[in-house]
Design a protein with these regions (language model features):
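Extended, compositionally biased non-globular segments that define protein topology
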Residues: 1-117
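Hydrophobic H-region at the start of alpha-helical membrane spans
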Residues: 9-13, 121-126, 148-154
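Short, structured active-site-proximal loop/turn typified by the sulfatase FGly-forming signature C/S-X-P-X-R
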Residues: 41-44, 205-261, 314-318
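Transmembrane alpha-helix boundary signature
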Residues: 99-106, 164-172
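Active-site-proximal N-terminal segment of extracellular/periplasmic enzymes that hydrolyze or transfer
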Residues: 167-230, 237
Length: 320
């Protein structure tokens, strides 16, 4: 029975950790509604995909502790001593993930989403501190009913509170519909031309090294007679959201293309953005999530060439 009780604590801690990952997906995708029809499939996928692996990892930690410790631990089905430390690990790792994703995606999130994600990450960080305090308070002694109540309440609130802070489903701010513009007949008459050459994946380091080797003489003349500078990119660093932002002049949340594909859980609610640093692409590889390619219909903002055409400029687009 001892090993079954060790397993039960591992399953509980893994469930809490899977809940944190579900919260992170909800934070990055404010358009996902919070209702049982949406949350249950999402929690089920993360519980199966991550919960099973985390259960094995937590169980291995407990076994290692049993081997190395002087006193063999005989935990209860819900052990305050065990779960306080396992939840410290889970909440600490989850808070680090949330802060890393907040830093990585913060520039492409709208202010409301960014602020709510900040609050959620702070709440999980505070939960990790509480779990750590419980663990330190019960070194070498069993927990009582009060400790178990505090632990259970913190586990529930550490998942529920960030969801409440995230708020109900909210559509990101979209661009205003175009208004009719009266074009002067002489506006489009001009002898000047603008040509934009855009190469996918051609970083400035690659171009400059090729120019130095004499392989790009035409681009070398452009560099010699023009200006050259580095540009920061967006996250995720995928062609579709980056080029959509270039074409529309709007961030991904406003132009409708936030990643290369749209992900679906059990062919249900679409997920536009997956978090980084937690192997979420493996969910697609192993069939937990399905992919749907982005199309031109997903672009909610107007590209610059359409805007210029409305104002009388002659525009030609090749290879878009």
């Amino acid at each position: 029975m001892r090993y079954l009780r060790m397993l039960s604590n591992s399953v509980i801690a893994a469930g809490v950790a899977s809940g944190y990952l579900t919260v992170l997906v909800l934070q990055l995708n404010p358009s996902i509604s919070i209702d049982p029809a949406t949350l249950l499939p999402l929690a089920l996928v993360f519980g199966v995909a991550y919960g099973a692996n985390l259960t094995v990892a937590f169980y291995a930690l407990i076994v290692m502790r049993q081997i190395l410790a002087v006193e063999v631990l005989s935990p209860g089905w819900l052990s305050v001593r065990l779960l306080s430390w396992l939840c410290t690990i889970a909440a600490g790792a989850a808070s680090a993930l949330m802060w890393l994703n907040f830093r990585g995606f913060g520039d492409v999130l709208d202010p409301i989403t960014r602020d709510r994600m900040f609050v959620g990450a702070a709440l999980v960080t505070a939960s990790a501190v509480i779990f750590l305090g419980l663990g330190l308070a019960h070194l070498g002694r069993r927990g009582g009913r009060i400790s178990a109540a505090i632990l259970s309440t913190t586990m529930v609130l550490s998942v529920a509170a960030p969801i409440v802070a995230r708020g109900p489903a909210r559509q990101p701010p979209l661009p205003m519909p175009p208004t009719a513009t009266v074009i002067d007949g002489g506006t489009s008459a001009s002898d000047s031309h603008i040509r934009m050459l855009m190469f996918d994946g051609a970083s400035l380091e690659v171009i400059l090294s090729s120019v130095a080797a004499g392989r790009l003489p035409n681009i070398a003349r452009i560099i010699d007679k023009g200006s050259v500078l580095h540009l920061a990119t967006l996250r995720p660093t995928q062609a579709e959201p980056v080029w959509s932002s270039i074409a529309t002049g709007r961030y991904p949340m406003s132009n409708g293309v936030r990643s290369a594909v749209v992900y679906r859980v059990l062919d249900g609610t679409p997920i536009q953005l997956l978090p980084d640093y937690c192997f979420t692409q493996a969910l697609v590889t192993f069939g937990f999530l399905s992919e749907q390619q982005q199309t031109a219909a997903d672009l909610l903002a107007r590209p610059i060439w359409n805007i210029l055409s409305d104002r009388g400029a002659s525009v030609g687009v090749i290879g878009w």
